Amino acid sequence: MTTHGWGTRILLGAALAALTLLGGCNDADSGERNRLPGFVSGSVRTTAYDGTSDDLLTAGLGKTGLASTAPAFANPSRPTSAELRRLAIWSNYRALVDMSANGGYGRFWGPNVDLDGNATLGEGKIPGTEYLAYSDDGSGRKNVTLLVQVPASFDPKQPCIVTATSSGSRGVYGAISAAGEWGLKRGCAVAYNDKGGGNGAHELGSDTITLIDGTLANAVLAGNASLFTANVTSGDLAAFNGRFPNRYAFKHAHSQQNPEQDWGHATLQAVEFAYWALNEQFGPVLDSSHHGVRYHPGDITTIAASVSNGGGAALAAAEQDTRRWITAVVVGEPQVNVRMSPNAIVREGGQPAPSFGRPLADYATLANLLQPCAAASASLAGEPYLSGLPAATTQSIRTQRCATLAAAGLVSGADTQSQAADALAQLHAAGYLADSDLLQASMWDSQAIPAIAVTYANAYTRSRVTDNLCNFSFATTSAPTGTVASPAASPMPAIFGVGNGVPPTGGIDLVFNTGAGVDHRLATPDASFAGALCLRQLWTNGMLDMPANVDAVRVNANLQGKPAIIVQGRSDALVPVNHASRAYVAQNSISEGARSQLVFYEVTNGQHFDAFLPVAGFDTRFVPVHYYNVQALNLMWRHLKNGAALPPSQVIRTVPRGGTPGAAPALTSANLPPIATSPGANAITAGAGAIDVPL
């Protein structure tokens, strides 16, 4: 590996570029100089990886290392940027796929599995070059991280780009297994960005932040080089630290910029940055310091891809694209807030869905309020258990949440079971499918929904960390009481490598500020009901400009005639399919009408988190949606390159593995039927604002 520091750009492939000047796109280049896009702030860091000691896909760990324990730091208090990158790739790769051999890793997907689904690639290390930089508006506060990976197998005569916008609020490697891996194996450049969230953490007590490579610095000294610094005056910070010690600010929650409104824009910038990198690497040599422009907008086959929030960003980018940067779209389980027309409708089995097209601010705050109670329903017996708390504590939380909801008039029933049944019925009425019932507990117990409710409420109200919105904050705590306490060692040195940008993460917890502050699950017998109700009321009462900020993130479902594939699991309990993919397809049939080239594949027994599939009860009931994301990318590639028709929209009826929870039999192709060319009765239809999905 060769690493070049800040302020230096290496012109890799100059000799090759000179030799191939007459090949590929724009052969008769006029000598136009390749210029760094104006949104790039500061220098570009360029690093070459040999594919042996280090590489683009696995950071030198290979297929075996990714499946093993986390790579260690030589000095845990001062990890190097290379060590942090390795840990970030290890943790982000594992966060989005099932890493168990029985679940399919190493057989259906993984660095060793080629694009045809065969395990032919050994450890799967991929040599190539990375380009890393910030995008900013001149304020030094946006600092969206952009990263381009150019594999050594990139063919400048057949250029392609795949976007891999981070999922969730993850750092820049946050979609490496979801989209980056496929792109690298295809020989495409991969354009990553962190959407302006990027796992940016600010340790308020020590005034410590992370830089673009994850290394630490003092916030004041770092200045505009900081990934994120909370917008708090020194006086306010000192006062806050005095009252609320051991607290942390996070970029997605506390940047006061509502970054979601710019996710599409950031993805387009990532593509433009990739064009610059490819021109820099393969463009004609103009002189000893400059390359020319070989590729102009639209010259490179570009697939906007990713999952979850990254999928939503890809759709937004395709909608906003006015310069032909994007050729096609392939996304999984996209988190999108759709601007719905009054005449749009979602039907399943011929029956109208009770609710569809709600924004995340609505359904997440409702779920955060009701899920702990709904989870107590006897009808959900045998649901997977994803809490780190003792089962007795969890059951007590559920009972107490039901009782408090009933006392507040928010659920009906004289006992826990009737209250839980009503809570579950309310979730159904709000658009959650019965297919996701057994995941309601997991979404709250894993703290996914509480984390999302708090982070997005902060973002949508543009709150400062010092506001302690709804009395929640992020802090280190002590076990087993969950009380806020100073950590034995700061979580900051490793946060770039292990954090996901939405506490609880990386040793930083979500706390409710009772007394000194306590883990929100343990702060009160009903698990901080008052805070959950406050979050809900921000939406229902239209407080603190939340409706306007939510409106700013909505998409219009007009892909401008671009071919597109959406894949989502029917059992998704984090981003309900009625509010996301189904709503998007319905609205697309209005926004684009006959121009639409969008197809939608709904996967039965598929849910949001493939990384949960090794857990007992997940393994027996649910299948990997990632498998179908990869198939969709292959289908789109054949469509773009060979003119093959995309299979029509359909329900894919998978077969759960079954067996004993925690010991399900190995996944086989029998569990994963192919996407059908002629789906027959499984066809999904859309037109004039209506989507019809068969039961």
UniProtKB/Swiss-Prot annotation:
Keyword Hydrolase attached: yes
Record: active site: 308
Catalytic reactions on record: (3R)-hydroxybutanoate dimer + H2O = 2 (R)-3-hydroxybutanoate + H(+)
Pathway assigned in UniProt: Lipid metabolism; butanoate metabolism
Enzyme Commission number: 3.1.1.22
GO biological process: butyrate metabolic process
Described purpose of this protein according to its UniProt entry: Participates in the degradation of poly-3-hydroxybutyrate (PHB). It works downstream of poly(3-hydroxybutyrate) depolymerase, hydrolyzing D(-)-3-hydroxybutyrate oligomers of various length (3HB-oligomers) into 3HB-monomers.
Full protein name: D-(-)-3-hydroxybutyrate oligomer hydrolase
Species of provenance: Burkholderia ambifaria (strain ATCC BAA-244 / DSM 16087 / CCUG 44356 / LMG 19182 / AMMD)
Upper classification of the organism: Bacteria, Pseudomonadati, Pseudomonadota, Betaproteobacteria, Burkholderiales
